[in-house]
Amino acid sequence: MLPTIITDIECLVTRPDRHNLVTVVVHTNKGVTGYGCATFQQRPLAVKAMVDEYLKPLLVGRDANHIEDLWHMMMVNAYWRNGPVINNAVAGVDMALWDIKGKLADMPLYHLFGGKSRDAIAAYSHAASDTLDGLYQEVERLYAQGYRHIRCQLGFYGGNPDALHSTRQPTEGAYYDQDQYMANTLAMFRALREKYGDRFHILHDVHERLFPNQAVQFAKAVETYRPYFIEDILPPAQNEWLAQIRSQSAVPLATGELFNNPAEWQNLVINRQVDFIRCHVSQIGGITPALKLGVFCQNFGVRLAWHCPPDMTPIGAAVNIHLNIHLHNAAIQEFVAYPENTRKVFPQAVEPENGYLYPIERPGIGVGIDLDAARQFPVVYRPHEWTQSRLPDGTIHTP
């Protein structure tokens, strides 16, 4: 096979709507261009610097066909490895290389991986409101669109604090009360089941807001409402507590969006302490490790529910779809509808149909970027106040 030489690499940061989105573009001597998602929205310029200053000079002139070798070289070339900056940068290139390979083969990625395991993947979206009445409206809107899996949140992550008992001069931050959050969330589950019965599956994201003993209590209490899964009940640093939760509750557990490397998920999967792995594909380094993770999880009966928040590009979301269509143990896919400007920048962005995401039949990833449109929306710094989460006494907590 004749080599496909990498001739240039670009990294573009654009903010068409609320989030800074990072896209890697790989050019080749055959005129075939690949696109990848490298979004780390809290530190987008760090990822751009990694691509522009380090990965581009490392890769230009090399054969784009050798994805496995290039992935390992990118990952170890700096010696210090793993973490959101280097992993997202590597992932953007990795996705672009797979995109090129699919285009050269004239095959969509899921065919290149080995074909489909299903006709479509069920999607879930987010219903959130500060009030139950508002939440009901959101649930019914999504249900009417065909969703039968809905993530429900009363208030923002950590709930909607009522009469917070804070200090006299609170440090700036996003405050919440863990006890109020648990009580309000359990009341939310009860109200949803009483109103809707089993018409749809309820998902919920704790978003790491509890201490371990509280997580045990919450998992036991919420089990009676039969959630599809409870997401990120603990921060990764406390995941050894999952064994205790597992021993006391049958509630399905999902985690993984902050994971960087196999050491973080290996024991959880082997010991079957989670039901769903929710890794963010660019956060773990791209398609190359995601395929391996999928097969590894299947061997232990753990299913896949890739992280797909609004702060990633439609290119990254399309990659998730290809993985889901191919990998046998894919369970469900998070999805949030794209705002207008994002659809202008990524005109091939894929949307669900009646609650399902269907295979993308275009060669490669099948979603690109309109570079001219993207340049109309330059990067804008955001302080991300919501990650400055604090308890009533002012202690900062995992967001």
Swiss-Prot record:
Pfam families per record: MR_MLE_C, MR_MLE_N
Chain coiled-coil ranges: none
BP-aspect Gene Ontology terms: amino acid catabolic process
GO molecular function: magnesium ion binding
List of residues binding D-arabinonate: H207, E257, R278, H307, E334
Alphabetical list of SMART domains matching this protein: MR_MLE
Binding site for Mg(2+): D205, E231, E257
Keyword terms of this UniProt record: Magnesium, Metal-binding
Keyword Magnesium: yes
Purpose: Has no detectable activity with D-mannonate and with a panel of 70 other acid sugars (in vitro), in spite of the conservation of the residues that are expected to be important for catalytic activity and cofactor binding. May have evolved a divergent function.
Family from the record: Belongs to the mandelate racemase/muconate lactonizing enzyme family. GalD subfamily.
Name of protein: D-galactonate dehydratase family member Pecwa_4254
